[in-house]
Amino acid sequence: MMPDPTRTLRVLFDVQHPAQVHLFKHVLWELQATGHETMVVARDKEVTLDLLDAYGIDHRSLSRRTGGLPAAVLELGVREVRTTLAARSFEPDVIVSRVSPPAVHAASVVGARSVVVTDTDIDDTLLGRTFHAITLPFADVVCRPPGLDLPTDPGKQRELGTQELAYLHPDRFTPDPTGLERHGVDPDEPFAVVRLAGWDAYHDVGHEGITESVFRKVVAMLSDRGRVFLSTERGRPTGLDVEPLPVPTHLIHDLLYYADIYVGDSGTMSTEAAMLGTPSVRLNSIDGDADERIFRTLETDYGLLFSFSDGEAALRKVRALMTDESTPAEWERRRSRLLDDAPDVTEELLTIIRETAAPTSTSAVPAPTG
């Protein structure tokens, strides 16, 4: 059924990670600009709420990230209840999320349609399989990259381009050096960005990122050539020539664009740096056949990202990239080739949301009385 262009939609977004703010922000703004109603429910994780505030996006925080599996299970239960209550209040036509059990369950309860966006292979852990098993069957539409196999009805799967390009595509992002200059960073001077993730999410169980010894070697190597800015979910290191990120969270992509190199164990920021044309070296224990499709694509098809599980091999690649004078021009050429192949993911997702919208939201299950 073709969407009715005159109909006003009510769309609820479930945002649980900083990257999801970026993924959905342009979709949300486009919906608002064309007269549709939106609501955002959020999770207090890392800088998620800071980003929403910086972009002026109204939101309701439903829970806070906690450490350990028992606490995470408890938080999930809290989000189930609070997401459903928020949906009852807002009466959405569509609920949009990443792989989020509370979002799809709330949609089922209130009679809304649900759109789930994912680009992640389901790992072999019991936790990973369970999380997807209690999400995907309840979704009306599952958006995934071409070639990703998911254990759900093929009829409700929709192909969606590389998700980071929903906010890093040139139609959506223009690098601005003035924001860096206001915060004491000269974009023409050499600097590197290093990222240390927390490795405490459900899909991180059994894996590890950059070790302390390799981290210190990376910083020593990079600081010989310029400033080193560190984004970390771990404790602040001592005795190293490293600085905290100099810009507010909403300017991180400008910082990544102008950086000479990125080194880290985070999947999201590694991908973002690569797509911005910054040489990106990713180091964690997941590298290999079990690695996510996007990392393999950026490395094999475009040569923008290099993933390693061996610290010494990663250090050798960092050294080679830093000493190769052809690197900047070559990486711009590689990025251009990626963008030539890339659609505007925001437009794709907008179309999917409009086509998925339920005819009405009056089919919602009434709230219990008494």
Where are these regions (language model features)?
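C-terminal amphipathic helix plus adjacent low-complexity
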Residues: 325-370
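A donor-sugar binding/catalytic signature common to diverse glycosyltransferases
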Residues: 95-106, 255-294
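A conserved, positively charged/aromatic
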Residues: 115-117, 126-142, 256
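Catalytic binding pocket for nucleotide-activated donors in carbohydrate/polymer assembly enzymes
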Residues: 275-326
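A nucleotide-sugar donor-handling region in carbohydrate enzymes
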Residues: 139-209
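Conserved nucleotide-sugar phosphate-binding/catalytic loop shared by glycosyltransferases and other
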Residues: 32-76
